[in-house]
């Protein structure tokens, strides 16, 4: 079984995907981490983030061992990831990796921006997670503070709105809800309530009550 979870930054889709994978005994891939790793690599090189050829080379040479680096969660790396993920050659370099992961039995839960529309359009279950931008900014602020990083909630909100616009308007795989994806508004759900809502969707699809 392949479960595709898409949505904007800080919507809670990553936590939801990880918990959903554990519930069903599936592997989990946070595809945003892959793009963050490319962004971090470009920052380390001091390269222009819009240098498509260099970014594609970084993507092709990614080491999965770096996916657990805490530095990937920084605001600067997140912004860099949003820029490089809009580059068609970067996306092309990473598509095969993601599809191989998803197609390996017994299946997987993948979360990102274009899982249900581009990476795994054949996924049995597709969920599109949304949350109010103000709520998302608050979550990001608390996450940064928990890591001991300075965080200005107003600045983070502005960055989130800017990223949303960039993700939705990019030419390559823009952020959008797949026609057959089920909407889950995570604005006011805690982790357990969000997981329960997602499980209800999965079970309804498997039972034929939802399509």
From Swiss-Prot:
- What keywords are assigned to this protein? ATP-binding, Cytoplasm, Kinase, Nucleotide-binding, Transferase
The main place the protein resides is cytoplasm
Q: Which Gene3D superfamilies match?
A: P-loop containing nucleotide triphosphate hydrolases (3.40.50.300)
Q: Which domain of life is it from?
A: Bacteria
Compartments, as annotated in UniProt: Cytoplasm
User: Do you know which InterPro entries this protein is assigned to?
Assistant: Cytidylate_kin (IPR003136), Cytidylate_kinase_dom (IPR011994), P-loop_NTPase (IPR027417)
Provide a Gene Ontology MF annotation, just one. Answer: CMP kinase activity
Summarize where ATP binds, as residue positions: 7-15
| Pfam families in alphabetical order | Cytidylate_kin (PF02224)
- Supply the EC number(s): 2.7.4.25
**Which GO terms of the cellular component aspect does the record hold?**
cytoplasm
The record's catalysed reaction(s) read:
CMP + ATP = CDP + ADP; dCMP + ATP = dCDP + ADP
Sorted alphabetically, the Gene Ontology BP terms of this entry are: pyrimidine nucleotide metabolic process
The protein's matches in NCBIfam families, at most eight in alphabetical order, are given as: cmk
Query: Which family does the record claim for this protein?
Result: Belongs to the cytidylate kinase family. Type 1 subfamily.
Q: What is this protein called?
A: Cytidylate kinase
Organism for this UniProt entry: Rhodopseudomonas palustris (strain BisA53)
Source taxonomy: Bacteria, Pseudomonadati, Pseudomonadota, Alphaproteobacteria, Hyphomicrobiales
Gene symbol of the encoding locus? cmk
